[in-house]
Amino acid sequence: MDTIHMSVTRPPPEKHMAGPGLKTHRPRVMSKSGHSNVRIDKVDGIYLLYLQDLWTTVIDMKWRYKLTLFAATFVMTWFLFGVIYYAIAFIHGDLEPSEAISNHTPCIMKVDSLTGAFLFSLESQTTIGYGVRSITEECPHAIFLLVAQLVITTLIEIFITGTFLAKIARPKKRAETIKFSHCAVITKQNGKLCLVIQVANMRKSLLIQCQLSGKLLQTHVTKEGERILLNQATVKFHVDSSSESPFLILPMTFYHVLDETSPLRDLTPQNLKEKEFELVVLLNATVESTSAVCQSRTSYIPEEIYWGFEFVPVVSLSKNGKYVADFSQFEQIRKSSDCTFYCADSEKQKLEEKYRQEDQRERELRTLLLHQSNV
């Protein structure tokens, strides 16, 4: 068949794909990469809420802020305890010249300035132990302060190490290796009109218990007149004859049947680009190596859904008998060979009515001929 191969970075050359009244930029709840575009505003005590959930707050930080925060935390603890050591030495009289006071035992040896106190705090916290500066038995409160510093800084180091490991090992990074097709297409599959997307696992390690679902977000007005800005409707997807736990070892094609139960049943080639909705697609899976649950997300708006197109096959069989996934074709679509679903619903009804009338006349003619033959 004659096919038109094209990239989804430019719109298809079809008249029904564009219109003079279309919006070029539509607001979307979720970006193509799966990040939320919702801004949380005017929340009382939001910073206090973040501090109460400090673990999640620190993990969600960007790496540059996290490293800056932790470096500043260490420097501040060294300096803070250094100032306290300096104050203890000042009160005890350790900063006076040693010649002026005979038989004087300082609280901390070789700490006669703020710089020396800072270095003693740093050496104690990092357990460097050069041996020049050391604490004595002269001041019990200095000994207590040293113990408190080691306990507090140990807890800080445990927290820092835990957040670093949690950020590195979280399944979000695994979810980023799941690739969705940039566009969706509407075509026929097994005689049914379907909305189709492609999903691929970019790693060789498998994903267990994969479940793909969709949420249709659009404005809805209730019978009482209430206007719901983002009404959510469930959009079910299936692979071939299976709807649960697909084997995502190769790029897979997921289908949503546009039947009477579908929230997208009113779509036509003419009104597709005029609709106001967003289709959010979620893929939940378990990582094989860590058993952690990950979720990958994307969304599609009407401008990213192409009517009458189909995806170019990605998987092929090589000469040596191995399956090959060519990702250079992953974003390629072509015009569907089946043109029976290009017409609008009204045109389809007219054709069906015409066929019914012709069939009715044929049956009447056969009945008349049969009656005449019997006579």
Curated annotation (Swiss-Prot):
Residues 1-22 are annotated as: Disordered. One of its GO terms (molecular function) is inward rectifier potassium channel activity. Pfam families: IRK, IRK_C. Inward rectifier potassium channels are characterized by a greater tendency to allow potassium to flow into the cell rather than out of it. Their voltage dependence is regulated by the concentration of extracellular potassium; as external potassium is raised, the voltage range of the channel opening shifts to more positive voltages. The inward rectification is mainly due to the blockage of outward current by internal magnesium. Residues 114-130 dip into the membrane without crossing it. The record marks E157 as: Role in the control of polyamine-mediated channel gating and in the blocking by intracellular magnesium. The lineage of its organism: Eukaryota, Metazoa, Chordata, Craniata, Vertebrata. This is ATP-sensitive inward rectifier potassium channel 15. It is a multi-pass membrane protein. GO terms for biological process: potassium ion import across plasma membrane; regulation of monoatomic ion transmembrane transport. A motif (Selectivity filter) lies at residues 127-132. InterPro entries: Ig_E-set, IRK_C, K_chnl_inward-rec_Kir, K_chnl_inward-rec_Kir1.3, K_chnl_inward-rec_Kir_cyto, Kir_TM. Belongs to the inward rectifier-type potassium channel (TC 1.A.2.1) family. KCNJ15 subfamily. Can form heteromultimeric channels with Kir5.1/KCNJ16. Interacts with PATJ. Residues 88-113, 131-139 are extracellular. One of its GO terms (cellular component) is plasma membrane. Channel activity is regulated by variations of cytosolic pH; reversibly inhibited by acidic pH values. Inhibited by Ba(2+) in a voltage-dependent manner. Inhibited by Cs(+) in a voltage-dependent manner. It catalyses: K(+)(in) = K(+)(out). The keyword Cell membrane applies. Residues 1-60, 166-375 are cytoplasmic.
